[in-house]
Amino acid sequence: MDADSGNTLAGARGAATRLPAQDLERARRFYSEKLGLEPVDERPGGLLYRCGQSEFALFLSTGASPGTFTQMGWTVDDVDAVVAELGRRGVVFEEVDLPGFRTRDGIAEIEGNYPSKGARGERGAWFRDSEGNMLGIGQPVV
């Protein structure tokens, strides 16, 4: 426990991301063909991926339902370029039109998101993987 903040996780070395998959082979194809990612480790019922300094795992789950909010996301330098490239690979981005939150060509401009990181906002885009998990891409606007 960090005595200064009272936060028991302040000293953690990272967070684990685990996404459910009802069909691991279908998920493997999606992450390979659409996102260009290959597993770095494979165990019965699970695949481990590495992206830069981060890792995430897909696990075989027959009961978990996909999320309606972002379950995992990546920070990128150029959200437009990433959206364009993934679109060419067949990724379909969510279109949202809600009061105060709207995407245009799959990308939302979010004012005031993540000010603690020195950003005045974020440009973000969301899509679902082959298992229905909501994934996001974000570019801080400084």
Regions from the PLM with identified roles:
Residues 1-25, 55, 69-72, 138-142:
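N-terminal beta-strand motif that seeds the catalytic metal site of vicinal oxygen chelate
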Residues 5-6, 26, 33-37, 111-115:
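Intrinsically disordered, low-complexity segments enriched in polar/charged residues with Gly/Pro
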Residues 11, 66, 118-119:
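Short, flexible hinge/linker loops that cap or flank conserved catalytic cores
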Residues 11-12, 18-56, 61-63, 81, ...:
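Core segments of cupin and vicinal oxygen chelate
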Residues 15, 44-45, 70, 123:
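Residue-level marker for the onset of beta-strands and adjacent loop->beta junctions
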Residues 23-25, 72-134, 139-142:
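Vicinal oxygen chelate
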Residues 61-65, 141-142:
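A short, sequence-level motif marking secondary-structure junctions
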